[in-house]
């Protein structure tokens, strides 16, 4: 049985990806979208979904417990896992930027950057010749400049509303982010025909979506 195991994040990305799979011609029961199960079997399509936290998707794919997965580019840039990036799905679009209190310069001696993306932040500041101290946080990143913990934050920006509501402004654009289809290298060889067919069908949906926005 040539079953495909697909790892996907719970929440908004799953909802958008589910709709895209439907448009691509996959027959998925309606209850899949509303299910609270962490593992969902679709025998008719020979597909199994594993639903997890966004940061865990590339881990499952790299270790082969999932053949393919859908992960944000932010997660892929941060983790640098051994996976194949097959397709930009053009969903959950946002970007990574630095932000801080308005009209404030970074500390010249030891600027501190708060973020949940330590590798992305370090690579960015190293690339522009800034020596910084990275403070890793897991939530409420916007608090860091407000309470004097950091000069800047590096975080995902979608609409900019959260920054504005907390009195912060953007300083530097770092990278665009969208959801990507990734594959385990061994699965890509062993189940290449199925995976390539999936990519072809999803790519058609992505192109149609883009043409509708022109």
Swiss-Prot record:
Enzyme Commission number, as recorded: 2.4.2.17
CDD domains: PBP2_HisGs
Record-linked PROSITE patterns: ATP_P_PHORIBOSYLTR
GO cellular component annotations of the record: cytoplasm
Gene Ontology MF annotations: ATP binding; ATP phosphoribosyltransferase activity
The keyword Kinase is assigned to this record: no
Family statement: Belongs to the ATP phosphoribosyltransferase family. Short subfamily.
Subunit note: Heteromultimer composed of HisG and HisZ subunits.
Record's comment describing the protein's domains: Lacks the C-terminal regulatory region which is replaced by HisZ.
Stated name of the protein: ATP phosphoribosyltransferase
């Amino acid at each position: 049985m040539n079953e495909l195991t697909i790892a996907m994040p719970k929440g908004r990305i799953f909802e958008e990806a589910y709709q895209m799979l439907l448009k691509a011609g996959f027959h998925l029961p309606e209850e899949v979208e509303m299910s609270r199960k962490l593992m969902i079997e679709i025998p008719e399509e020979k597909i199994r979904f594993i639903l997890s936290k966004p940061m865990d998707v590339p881990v499952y794919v790299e270790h082969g417990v999932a053949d393919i997965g859908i992960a944000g580019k932010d997660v892929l840039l941060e983790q640098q896992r051994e996976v194949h990036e097959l397709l930009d799905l053009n969903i959950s679009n946002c970007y990574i930027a630095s932000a801080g209190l308005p009209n404030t310069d970074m500390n010249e001696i030891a600027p501190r950057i708060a973020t949940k993306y330590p590798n992305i932040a370090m690579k960015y500041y190293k690339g522009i010749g800034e020596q910084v101290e990275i403070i890793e946080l897991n939530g409420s990143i916007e608090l860091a400049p407000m309470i004097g913990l950091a000069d800047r934050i590096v975080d995902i920006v979608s609409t900019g509303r959260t920054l504005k509501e907390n009195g912060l402004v953007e300083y530097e654009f770092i990278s665009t982010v969208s959801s990507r289809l990734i594959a385990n290298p061994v699965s890509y060889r062993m189940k290449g025909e199925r995976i390539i067919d999936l990519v072809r069908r999803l790519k058609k949906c992505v192109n149609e979506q883009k043409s509708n926005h022109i």
